[in-house]
Amino acid sequence: ESNWQNIGGGARGEHHFWGEPLFGYYRSSDTWVMRKHLQMLTDAGVDFLVFDATNAYTYSDRVKELISVWYEYLKDGVNVPKLAFYTNTSSGDTMRRIYDEIYNNAALKKQYPRLDELWFNWNGKPMIVGISKEADSTVKSYFTIKESTWPNAGRTDNGFPWMEFGRSLTAEAIYGVNGRKEVINVSLAQHSATCRFSATAWYGANDRTRSWHNGKNDTSANAMLYGYNFAEQFDFAIKNDPEMIFITGFNEWVAQRQKPWGNESIVFVDCADPNNSRDFEPMKG
């Protein structure tokens, strides 16, 4: 703990960056960064983005700011990535709030007459990821609901995987109804052994880092720089040719320090250092 504090680490409950973004330590409300992200993602041919609302927070203010930027380019004829949401905790309530605050917001519709052109559609309706049995009739009628699918939980053909642990690189990692190959997830790294990336970064555990391939973490010099884990999964996805490849993730620079776990005094769940993180947004260094 004292060593952590001495190098500038924060207390439990505080949020920490695992690395420095290419555009510096920006705030999520920075519309200049939004424009640069839009440029990069559009140039890369990304079809749609999914907002992470899995913790029951909708980020509606940020989404509205992003919509204002996206809409400018839509009007100028740019084929911008479309937008969707992923829910999990309190999924039914969260989906309804997203519908009310964003999709069915009268003020937004008046301000942006072509707003519906920004939504990512699947099977003829805007797509949302959630727990369908929790959805009310309005949400079920408006959206195509793909089932929230956690890597350490069971799967369903209509699932939309956040990432894969044990099912990775197997037929179970291919999701679709009525024989379709609808979606495969590709992620940059997976905290598959401990659900605490800090455990592998600093305490000798064996989560799947960015350097993981052929069933183990590659410890050779600079292995992290080659994206072995990502490439192995992407090769699998390309070989199986699904209708969607869902990549986890983008813009995940910050994690909250958690309470100690056994002899691990410094604990982070979703990201800890460059090798134990899953953000493919460019960074400095």
Where are these regions (language model features)?
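Glycan-processing catalytic domains of CAZymes
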Residues: 1-285
